[in-house]
Every structure is written in C-alpha cells, then in structure tokens.
Curated annotation (Swiss-Prot):
Record-given protein name: Type III pantothenate kinase
Assembly and oligomerization: Homodimer.
NCBIfam families: baf, PRK13318.1-5, PRK13318.1-6, PRK13321.1
One Gene Ontology biological process: coenzyme A biosynthetic process
Catalytic reactions of this protein: (R)-pantothenate + ATP = (R)-4'-phosphopantothenate + ADP + H(+)
Co-factor binding details: A monovalent cation. Ammonium or potassium.
Organism expressing this protein natively: Clostridium kluyveri (strain ATCC 8527 / DSM 555 / NBRC 12016 / NCIMB 10680 / K1)
PANTHER family: TYPE III PANTOTHENATE KINASE
Similarity comment text for this entry: Belongs to the type III pantothenate kinase family.
EC number: 2.7.1.33
Pfam families the record matches: Pan_kinase (PF03309)
Binding site for substrate: Y100, G107, A108, D109, R110, T184
GO MF annotation: an example: metal ion binding
Amino acid sequence: MILVLDVGNTNIVLGVYDDRELISVWRLSTDSKRTADEYGVQVIDLFLQSKLKPEDITGSIISSVVPTIMYSLEHMIIKYFQVSPIIVGPGVKTGINVKYDNPREVGADRIVNAVAAHEIYNRSLIIIDFGTATTFCAVTSAGDYLGGAICPGIKISSSALFEMAAKLPRVEIIRPQNIIGKNTVSSMQSGIVYGYIGQVDYIVKKMKMEMMDLGEEEPLVIATGGLAKLINEGTKSIDIIDSVLTLTGLRLIYEKNKE
C-alpha cells in the first residue's frame, strides 16, 4: 500500500492506495506550525480507525504548494511509516512536457492533475481545480502542458467582500435560485457564484479557441476540487468532475518513479 498526500493552502488530502484501488481518503487542516509528531499522531489514529496497519505502507508521495509545511510532513512519514516519500518537483518523472517559460514555476498540484487527466483521457484537456486558488490548465493530446490561468478561489472572493466592505456580511457560498437578489445576502451569493460561473465559461471558451488554433481537437474539460459540483450546477462548460484526480495523479507519478 502507498500513502499519497496532496498539500494545499487550506487542506491536506491523504489517500491510501492498495495497488490501484483507493481504499481511504482523509482531509486535515494545513497548519505549518504543527510538528511531525502532531501530524503523525493524527494520521496514525486515522489509520487505526479505518482498520489499516501503518506497517503495511511500503511507499509514499507528496505534492505540496506550501513549502513551510514540508519538513514536518516528510519527517512524519519517515518516523511513523519508515519510508522516505517522493516529493513532486524538479527531477521527478511525470511524462508531462512543461511548456511554461519557467517550468519550475508551475505548482506541483497542477502537474499532478495534468498527469492524471492525460493518463486517463489521452486527449486535449482543460483541467479546472477549484481550490484556495482556482487554476485552469491546458494540456495537449501529446501531453504538453501549455500553461493556463490562476484566479482567486471562490472562498477568497467571498472573504474579500466581507473583510473589505464594512456593511457586507459573511455569507454561505450557495447558488441562489435567481440571479437577481432581493436582499444583501442573496445579492452577494448571486454575485459570487454566478460571477464565478461566468468566469469559468469565459476562460474555458477562450482557452478552447487558443488550443484549437494550435491544431488541437476541442478539449475535454475536467474539474476537480471541493466546489466543482457547485459551479457545475450552473454551467455547461464542464464535461467531467473527478473528485480524486489529484490523488490519482500522485499514484501514477509514484509508479513512474518507484525503484
């Protein structure tokens, strides 16, 4: 079995694979102040609750966009699972040809998603990840990572309204039935959610045009991340939602790099 970790700005998603089967998924808060032992105790407890044996873990891989937490997580895995994790970054085999001006600038999570989507669908792709930031990534049928777009996440946008506008309240992020709000809360929800849906539709439309101008077939649009289902309810731009796309990518990269 292998332990995979997708470390985001807000949450750490952990998955356990038995061969190619994902048998457990957990979500922890990202906290750079926590020690290896604090994370270790929590992860071991999750294993025991799921009736899994830590000693059955034979390998691990981490993708992270939070450098300050890596020391704790890497040493947690070494100490509590007796394996040295693969860290997704320069020098790790992915099978993806990154066409960015500076390939080192591309977030590990974006590469991991590209690996999974390319392996599964093997065609032109646009990958949307609704996380703390929302990312759009363009991948060709040959596996070239062309680049993409990075936007503030929905929760960041909502928090900014509350924090920067004195009279606006904090609101739950839900899609209101009507776009014309009848009160402050529904008006904010309309602007946040429908504004985001419009953003998705426009960026996907323009990315498709640019990719097809390069000779690619019309891309398939894959979405992942916690708010993908909410946005998908109001758009026809998304073809497939894959909630474990990043974990799948981590497993695939592990298989490409295991000794």
